[in-house]
Regions:
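Active-site-proximal beta-alpha loop/turn segments in soluble metabolic enzymes
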Residues: 180-189, 224-230
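Outer-membrane beta-barrel pore domains
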Residues: 48-50, 97-101, 109-112, 121, ...
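Outer membrane beta-barrel
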Residues: 22-184, 192-196, 203-212, 290-294, ...
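Sec-dependent N-terminal signal peptides
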Residues: 6-8
Length: 364
């Protein structure tokens, strides 16, 4: 009898313990956290006269945490790349922001994130489809910006409001707006001249997959070394006044995009440099257009791109390229990109040269 009572008490204790364990719940915000990322491996060769190169390259790696807390989404994204050059890797936090998304008509984002300028800038490198962003995007959207801002991946620190308006009978919204206020100095940089950058954009979406828009940007970059009226070096700010016109169609694996960008304002012309180079002038512009179409849906895409960047808004300073290639998808998480470019750089004595790029990209 005593043994039976002991066994009974043990059974009750085990049952109670099991019930206690089942009542422990993980908070919903923890359940909502998602980890993802991707890597891009690259081989690139080019043959400009006197400066031919070919090299394997770790283009970049991204590690992404996304989460949701009530009506707020948040993201933290770390990037590793050899942006400084072979043997000089850079690992940094590129995105850290929270976003209030209760209403589709009005959303708010705050932190460090992509500037609200152009269609291409916010695109992930792995989904952008090319060996690099267009030259005009790199120079006028805060990558290796012509002002001298260090490479910031098109990002800045600030606050942005945005939303989609005017739903049609099918619920598809026809108009998008976005306006942001930023420090204007790039990633991990505090304000240097107490003058904020204001960037805005609007676009219409008349049919599914099509959007046509325009963007504007006014601001400054502080802590620049420049000349005063007497030729003495002084510290001050340079202006950034820019606009862009954009069009894109993306539907059923077909992607076509074209953008024109214009910039007014002096700069150093070199990323990470704070000395104004007046010989570069205060005007620059550029454009690109590309098409990516399915040859075998879900497996093989063909692509072509034309781009031009004029560092002084003159043809004598233009760099143009004509590009063609293929993107092959082994699975949805593994793809290979092949690209050939014929480049004309008028700043070189022998302006024409070739470039070949091969990439293996994966997602997780």
């Amino acid at each position: 009898m005593k043994k039976l009572m002991t066994l009974a008490f043990m059974a009750i204790a085990l049952t109670a313990n099991a019930q206690e364990k089942t009542t422990i719940e993980v908070p919903q915000w923890v359940k909502n956290i998602k980890f993802s990322g991707y890597g891009m491996l690259q081989y690139q060769g080019q043959d400009p006269e006197g400066n031919a190169t070919n090299s394997f390259n770790l283009r970049l790696a991204r590690f992404i945490l996304d989460g949701k807390i009530g009506d707020f989404d948040w993201r933290a994204q770390i990037q590793g790349t050899n942006v400084k050059g072979p043997g000089e890797p850079t690992v940094q936090l590129v995105d850290l922001y929270a976003e209030w998304r209760k209403y589709p008509e009005f959303k708010v984002r705050a932190g460090q994130f992509k500037r609200a300028f152009t269609y291409e800038n916010p695109t992930h490198p792995i989904t952008q489809g090319w060996r690099a962003y267009a030259d005009v995007i790199n120079n006028l959207s805060g990558f290796g910006d012509r002002t001298g801002e260090k490479s910031s991946g098109g990002r800045d620190i600030g606050v942005q409001i945005f939303g989609d308006l005017f739903p049609n009978a099918n619920g598809r919204r026809l108009f998008h707006y976005q306006v942001g206020v930023y420090n204007g100095e790039g990633v991990h940089q505090k304000e240097k001249d107490n003058r904020k950058d204001i960037i805005g954009g609007i676009w219409v979406m008349p049919i599914k997959g099509l959007r046509i828009g325009a963007f504007g940007w006014t601001g400054s970059r502080g802590d620049m070394t420049m000349k005063d009226a007497d030729g003495n070096n002084v510290t001050g700010s340079v202006s950034k006044n820019r606009y862009a016109f954009s069009a894109e169609y993306s539907q059923d694996e077909y992607m076509f995009r074209a953008e024109y960008l214009h910039s007014q304002g002096f700069g150093s012309g070199k990323a990470g440099n704070n000395t104004v180079d007046y010989s570069l002038g205060d005007l620059a512009d550029g454009w690109y257009a590309f098409g990516i179409v399915p040859v075998i849906k879900g497996k093989l895409h063909a692509k072509a791109r034309y781009q031009c960047y004029r560092a002084q808004k003159e043809w004598g300073t233009s760099k143009s390229s004509y590009e063609a290639g293929l993107n092959y998808f082994f699975t949805k998480n593994l793809e290979m990109h092949l690209e050939y470019a014929r480049i004309n750089d008028r700043k070189l004595e022998k302006s024409d040269y070739n470039l070949v790029d091969l990439e293996m990209d994966f997602r997780f």
